C-alpha cells in the first residue's frame, strides 16, 4: 500500500453491522476534460474531447450547437435535408454566437440531388466554416474534395489545413478513402471548375481527406447494412 494509507478499511452498514475489507486501490476524482485524446481538443479548439453528431433536418439545431459550443464541446448542425438558404441562416446565427469557431456543419452526400451538396459546400466556403462532418458517403465526391482542398495553404512550417473534415463511416473501404489523399480524377474536376488552384491540388497529394473518423453503427434511417 502507498505510504500513509491503511491496507484495511472498516465501515458500518445501514443495518449497523461493522465490516472490515482490504483496500484494493484509490480512484481519484476525474474531470471530464481529462477523458479522451487531448489532440482532438487542440485540433478543434474544444475543452472536452467529445463530439455531438449531426441530426438531420435541423434537429441538431442552432440552439444545440451554440449551447454545447459555449461549454467547449464540438457539435454539428444537422444540415442534411435542408436547402442551402436555410443552411446559410444557420451559419450566420451560429457564427454570431460562437465567433471563435467551436462548431461544425454536416455535409451529407446527396447522389440524387448533387445541387444540395454543392450548395452546402459553397455556403461553407463563403462563410468560412472550418469544420464539416461528412456523412453517408460511399465514395468521395468533387464537392467534399473541393471543401478540403480549398483550405490548404503552403506555409514556412509545412501545409496549413484550415478546412477540417470529420468523416462518419460504416464501411472499411470508405474509411480508407478518407484516410488517403484525394484521387486525381476529383482534383482534375475541381481544377476544371476553378474551385481550387494548382498549388492546392499539389498540396493535397500530401494530405489525407479527413482529420477524424466517426465509426457509425447500423441505424433505423438510411443504412447500407454494413456497420463497422
Ranges and model annotations:
Residues 1-228:
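Active-site entrance/lid segments in N-terminal catalytic domains of soluble metabolic enzymes
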